[in-house]
Amino acid sequence: FPALNARPKELLDEWLAALTAQIDAARRADPGRKVGPFAVNQIVHHSNDRLDHDVALCVKHKVPMIITSLRAPGDVVKEVHGYGGIVFHDVINVRHAQKALEAGVDGLILVAAGAGGHAGTLSPFVLVSEVRRFWDGPIALSGAMTNGAQILAAQAMGADLAYMGTRFIPTPEAKAVHADK
C-alpha cells in the first residue's frame, strides 16, 4: 500500500503496527500456513516531504518489502537492507532500470503501457526484452494485467511476476469509492 495513503502521517505507525501484529498472530495460529509478506510504496521524489518520516517507520516495523518510485532509491535501499528487507523499484524505461540497479535494488517493476494512471508508455514486449539483456534478477511486469492469460504471457516474455492493481479496485477490501468500483 502507498505510505502516503496514511493521513495524517502518524496513522502510518498505527497501520504498520496493526498489520504486523495480525500477520504475526496468523503465523502463530497456524504455523504451517503460508502468510505472504506485505509491501509499502514509497515515493522517493523530492516533492515527498514525508519520505524520511515514512521510511523511518518502515525501518522500525521492518517492513519486508519496499516499493520505490520516481527517483533512484539509494538511501532507502541502504536503510531497508540494514534490517534484511528488500526493495523493488518502479521503472518506465531502460535508463531508469539501470539507475535503480546501480542504487542496489533487489528487483524491478517494469511499468509498461496500460498501467492505469501511471507513466509507462513502452510495450511490455520491448521493455521486458530490453531489461533482460542486462538484468537476470526479479522482474515484475505492470500494465494491462487483468487475468491469468496475461500473467502467463508476462512469464513467457521473461517477467517473474505480474503486478496487478486496477483489477483489485472492485474488491470488498479496496476502500475505493463505489463510483470507481
Model-derived features: where do they sit?
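Conserved active-site-proximal phosphate/metal-binding subdomains
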Residues: 121-136, 140, 146-181
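Active-site entrance/lid segments in N-terminal catalytic domains of soluble metabolic enzymes
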Residues: 1-138
